[in-house]
């Protein structure tokens, strides 16, 4: 019997995001919160560059449900604070970025850095520590090349570390490439994806749909990991992806 959509794997283009993941930087198994593509409109055509999946520690579900249970998927999608609560919540997160089109590490890190710095400056929190963290971040990516199917993994600890890992074929790496101890950077990387100016509205909507269903059915993250879960509305979309 297949898993209900709110805890099932998600396919974005030809890339599958498993229902659970255990990345470098944590001893815990995380559940898939949602996934979607990132792209841009170029000459009237939507061009997809990456597929993005956001995973959450099991404790994230009851933690978020205290405030957000009872809200519809539409309400969650439109709520800036809901996504801030995911970004800043006291639980571990994993963000996986898989390339649909080839990209150099320099191209990727420069764009992420630009978004992070813009967020910090708008919040009045850009200082020497953040500047040095960005330098380290760019150094980690400086000699990387990402062909289609290659993945970047960011494990974000609530204690402030950002663990960065790479995989050329999309499988989960066993060893981290770098760890940067800077909580604002760890949060800003995820903020740049699902925040108010996040680069993947598809991933945001997928998160809202799946989490609202988990809240509604009183499902905890541990049940999602073990498969002891049933979701009332099994017709909900697994994500918003183009065929």
Swiss-Prot record:
The keyword Isomerase applies. Substrate binds at residues 50, 115, 192. One of its GO terms (molecular function) is chalcone isomerase activity. It comes from the Eukaryota. It catalyses: a chalcone = a flavanone. Keywords: Flavonoid biosynthesis, Isomerase. One of its GO terms (biological process) is flavonoid biosynthetic process. InterPro entries: CFI, Chalcone_isomerase, Chalcone_isomerase_3-sand, Chalcone_isomerase_bundle_sf, Chalcone_isomerase_sf. Pathway: Secondary metabolite biosynthesis; flavonoid biosynthesis. The keyword Isomerase applies. Catalyzes the intramolecular cyclization of bicyclic chalcones into tricyclic (S)-flavanones. Responsible for the isomerization of 4,2',4',6'-tetrahydroxychalcone (also termed chalcone) into naringenin. This is Chalcone--flavanone isomerase. It comes from Ipomoea batatas. The lineage of its organism: Eukaryota, Viridiplantae, Streptophyta, Embryophyta, Tracheophyta.
């Amino acid at each position: 019997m297949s898993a209900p959509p709110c805890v099932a794997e998600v396919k974005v283009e030809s890339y599958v995001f498993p229902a659970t993941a255990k990345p470098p930087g944590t001893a815990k198994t995380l559940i898939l919160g949602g996934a979607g593509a990132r792209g841009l409109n170029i000459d009237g055509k939507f061009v997809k560059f990456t597929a993005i999946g956001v995973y959450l520690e099991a404790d994230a579900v009851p933690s978020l449900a205290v405030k957000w249970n009872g809200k519809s998927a539409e309400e969650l999608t439109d709520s800036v604070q809901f996504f801030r609560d995911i970004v800043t919540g006291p639980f571990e997160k994993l963000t996986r970025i898989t390339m649909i089109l080839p990209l150099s590490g320099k191209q990727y890190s420069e764009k992420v850095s630009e978004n992070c710095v813009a967020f910090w400056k708008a919040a009045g929190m850009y200082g020497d520590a953040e500047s040095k963290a960005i330098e380290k971040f760019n150094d980690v990516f400086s000699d990387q090349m990402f062909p289609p199917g290659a993945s970047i993994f960011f494990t974000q600890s609530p204690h402030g570390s950002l663990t960065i890992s790479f995989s050329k074929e999309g499988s989960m790496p066993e060893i981290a490439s770098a760890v940067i101890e800077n909580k604002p950077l760890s949060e800003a990387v995820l903020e740049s994806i699902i925040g108010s100016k996040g680069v993947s509205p598809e991933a945001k909507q997928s998160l809202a749909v799946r989490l609202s269903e988990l809240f509604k059915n009183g499902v905890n993250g541990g049940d999602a990991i073990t498969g002891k879960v049933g979701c009332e509305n099994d017709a909900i979309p697994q994500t918003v992806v183009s065929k």
